[in-house]
């Protein structure tokens, strides 16, 4: 080890070059690192959505949810499985373990879903399996509204033009249209006219299936030519559908237009969206797991001017929400703290060393260690985020320790009469092994945090290894650069300056005061021990009364809300409830914008977001605004309204801070009864502001009983009855038609 330190003291150019290489390579690595709010976590969810138009919740549960659940429960890497069976739709969510391979789990899930596809009802749509890795919330929401275009027209334009452009931005995983209404050929049957003309629902379905048919007619080949054939066997307009013959009574033809109203309209009437009180359609921008959110949003903002320039007259585009505003502010605050911490450390070092030259040597260690650790961050695939920046803030006070020890030891030999060069040689020999021991000890304290499993380990791994890496780099610099700088910069001071003398006198006074207090405490040992016991007891009390949480709630300038209408409600009812919520929110001066998506995730629910004014323009914090809104939402009579802060950490879902899962081998009626009793007890306790049960067992329904004997006498079977009901009431999908290069459903 002596030869190692001697090499750099005797060869100052080598020591300088090595340090410059650390600075250069670390700086280049730092410029290439991603900048994000938190470390990237591979939290992945796989969602299986199956629609069965017109089916009741119990039918969905028994014929769709249960078979798929049983099939995918053994899929690889699953941590938890959650399913929901609602009117028309089954949703199964698989939450994967953090260490699971998402691609392998996706392939395994697809295979198992395909195995049970034949067991599902014939009229049910194919299950849609979607994998989502990374943040569950969008990085940005774009709002599109118009006074002249319908929601379907806006949605169609966004689908054809805007969505594809946004998805070409580097790092964008999906540009999802929310609150829109897709075009469809809607056929509204008139049962009275159908009965008068002797036409059944099955006749209509059969005619549509037979006469709106897409044909691949092939091509005609001759000796020198080859010409494709386009057979016009499909329908392309409401007028063409109206002329479709569905029955013939002698010479009289019954056309579809005789028994139905036909129009090109929205595919469904179960969703709508609002931005600041105006009807709108949103696009949510979701980033890939490895993408830098700041770069992604910068890319989206860069193409927004050209998107706005190409919008049809009367269509406006607005950035409704940008999550990177908080990310940038957070990183700025931590970076500012980093600079402040460095300045404080420099002042403290100067006050204790009392010499500019002695102070300069450990100060050099700060940028070299912080920049040098960037090499390790890049090698490990880490990013610059709040936790790695926090590690750098803490490292500032640690990386100077080794250099200060080296400077003090060498300075002691110089004061004893040795030359700076000889003092550096001897001082480095004496302190080399203690420096190595200090470095390894500090690194060993923090590094084990990086091996913790679960969400905590995924979040704090980068923090631990960044801190340990900075300490290791500082130890290397203390053994290579610091002794060389001491041999060149330090000298024997014959007389101290006035500032050094002032600092020495101040510390001498402090030392004398401490000495007096120390003697006093030794003279009253019983009292000293009693004070110690009291402090320890008070510490225990304070620890027990301190709230515990994985991460504190931060003021992100954004609040979320879920609105749930009664089970009998439709979209009109939900819109009425959200309008009341919008009125209450707009009365809060700290709120700048409000967006709402009605019919999400179902027609009796809505999702809302409240954007707060910039931090400098409001006096109340996000938590205070939430506390002001919650009582107002409890007074909304039409629905249950819950407001909450966005999740503080990636991988968390936000929402209710306390949740209970009730399981039973009995029926759902028993489960609902127990859940409602628990909810009532929670309300009566006075400890909960909002309570909700996700099992809704009070949904009203009409029960249609068929007299099988009478049906047989008139020649009607159960399949005919079921098909007729599904066609008349369920809004069944029949087939597709083409319009301007895109296909739409016939319903």
Language-model segments: residues:
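Membrane-proximal extracytoplasmic
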Residues: 1-343, 384, 458, 639, ...
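Signature of alpha-helical transmembrane segments and their immediate interfacial
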Residues: 1-35, 431, 499-550, 610, ...
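Hydrophobic alpha-helical transmembrane segments of multipass membrane transporters and ion channels
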Residues: 14-18, 335-344, 365, 369, ...
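Hydrophobic transmembrane alpha-helices and their membrane-interface caps
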Residues: 25-32, 36-37, 343-412, 419, ...
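C-terminal transmembrane helical bundles of large multi-pass transporters
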Residues: 29, 268, 323, 360, ...
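Helix-loop junctions and hydrophobic alpha-helical segments within the transmembrane domains
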Residues: 320, 327, 331, 407, ...
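Hydrophobic, glycine/alanine-rich multi-pass transmembrane helices and their short helix-loop junctions
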Residues: 347-352, 372-387, 436-487, 540, ...
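Juxtamembrane segments of multi-pass membrane proteins
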Residues: 532-632, 656, 677, 708
